[in-house]
């Protein structure tokens, strides 16, 4: 057991079943001067394992504003997280996790597919009480209905 990083190396576009290229993953848009949430964290479920430790099911999503700028329909990640916590309330946990993700995203100059996963890994490493991650499921769906270039792109 242990905390393993979330990887984007085999990230597939769900709409076309094609592997997303490294070049596409590096496309990013500026987000450094925005006070809105760049990545949303949702606690889907809280339960206890056999040793009475808290287990979370977390969901991360790139917010709509940046998905639209990047021509991405959906960019997200789900995972089961094992913790050292004995108890917690849903509301305090949601608030703590979102604040931590906001603080990580504040340090970004730009956001794109690669930076999304870098931020999730940084988030997991910053939570010292997380002892293991399992059932990591990444998802990405690119726009295919229009033939436009991504504006304000940073490469």
Swiss-Prot record:
Family of the protein in this entry: Belongs to the nanovirus U1 protein family.
This protein's name: Protein U1
Organism field: Faba bean necrotic yellows virus (isolate Egyptian EV1-93)
Taxonomic lineage of the native organism: Viruses, Monodnaviria, Shotokuvirae, Cressdnaviricota, Arfiviricetes
Gene that specifies this protein: DNA-U1
